[in-house]
Amino acid sequence: IDNDILKSMRRKVDENGTRNLLENLKNNYPSLALRSTFIVGYPGETRAKFKKLIEFIKDTKFDYAGFFPYSKEPNTASFYMKKHLSNWTKKHRWNKIKKVQNQIALEKAKEMMGQEIEVLVDYFDENTGEYVGHSQKLSPLVDFGVRFVDNGNINCAQIIKVKIYDFDGSDFKGEVL
C-alpha cells in the first residue's frame, strides 16, 4: 500500500485512492465481500513499509486475502531493482501477514454464526455424507465451504437456505431451513 512500492510496481493507484475506493465500496455495498492479493518482500520493502501493509490489512479487514512472497522474474522492472530482500525475510513476512489475515478470517467466521444465508449446492461429499456449497461471498475451491446434511431431496446447482451454526477452521456447518 506504500506509494513508493506501488509506483515501482507501475501501479496506477496510490494509497489514498485505494483507501477511498475501499471505503466507498464498504459504505455503498455493506454485504460486499472484499478480496485481494498482496506481494510481500518486494524490493525496497522496509520494515516500516511492511508494518504499514499489516496495519492496512488490519484496518481494511478483507474477507479474503492471499499473500505471495516476491519472486524475481526475468524481464520485469523489479528484476533489475536493487534492495532485494533475503528469502528468509520474505518467508518470515509472508508467515506474519498470513497470521494477521487468518485472525481476521476467524473473526469474520464468528460473525456468521446464526446467520441465514443462501447456498449454491456444489456437490455431495460421499466421505462425510454432507452436501457442500458456497454463498455469494464464498468462491468455490478457494474459500471456506458450507457443509450441511439433508434428507436427500437436494440437487447440485440448487440454491437453498442454510442457517450457519459452526465453523471448524476450514468450513462452515449449517442446517437446512
Can you annotate each of these PLM segments?
Residues 80-177:
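Terminal RNA-binding accessory module
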